[in-house]
Amino acid sequence: MNKLSCLYCRRRKIKCDKNRPCHNCFVAKRECIIAGDNRKKRHTKTYVEALESQLANMESTLAKIKVAPVEKIPSLLAGISFKDHLSASLPNKTSYEQADTNATSKSLVDLPVSLEVRGRNTVTFYGPTSIFGTSFTSSPRPPPSASIEDTYPIIHCLQLFFKWQYAQFLFIHRESFLFEYFHRSNDNMYCSEHLIYALCAIGCRSSEDSLLVNQADAFYKMAWDALESYGLENSHITSAQCLLCLGFYKIAMGNTSHGWLLCGMAFRMGQDLGFHLDPRDWHINNVPVVSEEQAALRSRIYWGCYVADVFVSFILGRPTTLSKSDTSVPTSDDLPDFSGIEDFMLERGGAHASSITISQLLNLIVSLSNITDAILLNVFAPYSTKYGIDLRLQNVGKYNLELMKWHFELPPNLSWKKTELRDFGQSPELCFLCLYFFLIRLCLNRPFLSKKGLYVNDMTPRNICIDSIEDVKVLIRAYRENLGLHHTPLIIVYACIVSCSTVFMLFDGATPSEIVALEQDIKFFLHVLTKISKNWDLASKSINLIQKKSTMYDTNARANDTDVDFSNDKQNTHDFQISHDENLIQLFNDESNFFNLNDLGDFQSIFGGPQF
């Protein structure tokens, strides 16, 4: 049996049984071709350096010819040398280049913006109100380091990241990152040393190997050290991506304050790069700043960051940084797939998962994030309280209908019914999409469980929450049975915590039969959190808080003794400050009706808070 899928199955993106011929080729009456495995083939350092030098020579010569007068081109061609010691740096501006610049005095950018060129792959953006001048300047910056220590299982950690956590980190384009990773140079745009270590820190948390899981903090430190060495003052897209990954890591480990700061730094650095504006409108000397392919990649990165910003703000109950009204970037389009990265992709189970593209998934999450952002502004923002509870209840009903409309308008291959929901739990991507939808419904309706009013089709906040919790359980069960909880994505941790918080609120006013069902829900989510507590410290710390809360309701919440151990995790060596524990207490303590504004920001924490 072959180790690789045949070319026909790769192009069709279908599972290959790896026989010769495979079943798919036999049925289609096609020749079953197995391409050679060149992934481990590496050229010598001398050979690579020679090619890089020759490429730099060609680029330098072409740059001179492009701006030179016609009469000077023959002399430039005569002076071409094919030696391998030429510098890769571009020539300084000559007199004829300066004359061409003066001739083109009118910028093609409509608004009075400034672009500061910081090397070949970085352009810093200044808006119309900036105090900086509009001249295009060039400032040197150190190249991103491409050296990676071989003492860590880098490849395996990256595989874990892209297989299990990728759905929540779509601000990274997998194909471009891996292409540059396997073709390393000092001039990468989408791969850097600090970003590699940041992805490894998250990826190894999805490992079944406890030794590899324990290396996550070491990867985090290596990522931060490499980022500091490169320089936070040197804005780069991989640095922004690295900061955002490290922010997610800190939040998942229970350090919400540190994670929030890192995420904010990432978004600010992205705005410094102008990633919220369409680069197709940018020209320097009548030459586009970026190519169409680069513009498409920047679109993927921006909208991935937008989704991450809304998601982090939503789970922490805080204001967003990126606004849809501030961007001119078009929605993400499908980008070409690369062959040879099958080891970094999970074979999608079910008919629904096999028919979705990453761009399609991202655009659906973006539209869902737009609703989420509106909920934060019009339901949970402090200024909305002055309009009274009646208007807020109207907004709750409005956004419940918006969520229903989003669900009804899903494409046929992604629209789910309750009987089909288990199929969506077989794919990390679709599981994220569904859980995010139910997470929003829970957080929107949970504070209003005790309020009564006129609702369409009996869509009371209580009924919506009970229904959503059941759907969350179906998805998690399907994920556990098909993929296992040791590869749990972060969204499942958040879904369990929010579901438990909602269940505790549902105890008030519940009938005896409902109380029994709610007790079983607590047991289920405790069981899941216990299983994944060795991978994510946020789950580990939440268990004790849930148990303490459950005793207040006399639920006697326990999981099966043979499967779950609710004792403190002795292997957990992470040190958390008291302020971080207080953040977690907010997840479940609805007695804190007067939340700490210094800790929670302008919005109340949607993980836990007062009932209205």
Curated annotation (Swiss-Prot):
In which residue ranges does the UniProt entry place its DNA-binding region annotation?
6-32
Q: Which PANTHER family match?
A: TY1 ENHANCER ACTIVATOR
Q: Which keywords does this Swiss-Prot/TrEMBL entry list?
A: Cytoplasm, DNA-binding, Metal-binding, Nucleus, Transcription, Transcription regulation, Zinc
Cellular component per GO?
cytosol; nucleus
Question: Which InterPro entries has this protein been placed in?
Answer: Transcr_Regulatory_Elem, Transcription_factor_dom_fun, Zn2-C6_fun-type_DNA-bd_sf, Zn2Cys6_DnaBD
UniProt name for this protein: Uncharacterized transcriptional regulatory protein C777.02
Q: Share an example GO biological-process annotation for this protein.
A: regulation of transcription by RNA polymerase II
Q: Which organism is it from?
A: Schizosaccharomyces pombe (strain 972 / ATCC 24843)
**Domain of life (superkingdom):** Eukaryota
Q: Which GO terms describe its molecular function?
A: DNA-binding transcription factor activity, RNA polymerase II-specific; RNA polymerase II cis-regulatory region sequence-specific DNA binding; zinc ion binding
Q: Where in the cell is it found?
A: Cytoplasm; Nucleus
In terms of one coarse class, where is the protein primarily found? cytoplasm
